[in-house]
Amino acid sequence: MNNIIKMLNDEQMKTDVPDFGAGDTVVVQVRVKEGEKERLQAFEGLVIAKRNRGLHSAFTVRKISNGEGVERAFQTHSPLIASIEVKRRGRVRRAKLYYLRERSGKSARIREKLGTK
């Protein structure tokens, strides 16, 4: 039984997901269906949390829109996600950046990770 579930999960997992983590700035292209038409909507922001659970992996992206903080949670392997592009790597010392919710301006900045390790 477990082998069947594992096989189905592996079949549905995407292979083109880039390597990213908390602190990275990403652009997520989401498929949006409006009536009969379908279009791509870009959501660019900072990854504040990532949850790695195989097919059930998810991540949360936060951006500031018109002075208001907007967070959106995405399922990593969802068919509604067209692509994920990493714009900038951030250097952080925490796995979850929920403390950024209370901060604004210069105190909410994330240092950029330079070079590759």
Curated annotation (Swiss-Prot):
Keywords: Ribonucleoprotein, Ribosomal protein. GO terms for molecular function: structural constituent of ribosome. The keyword Transmembrane helix does not apply. Transmembrane segments: none annotated. GO terms for biological process: translation. SUPFAM superfamilies: Translation proteins SH3-like domain. One of its GO terms (cellular component) is cytosolic large ribosomal subunit. It comes from the Bacteria. It holds the Pfam family Ribosomal_L19. Belongs to the bacterial ribosomal protein bL19 family. This protein is located at the 30S-50S ribosomal subunit interface and may play a role in the structure and function of the aminoacyl-tRNA binding site. This is Large ribosomal subunit protein bL19. It comes from Shewanella denitrificans (strain OS217 / ATCC BAA-1090 / DSM 15013). The gene is rplS.
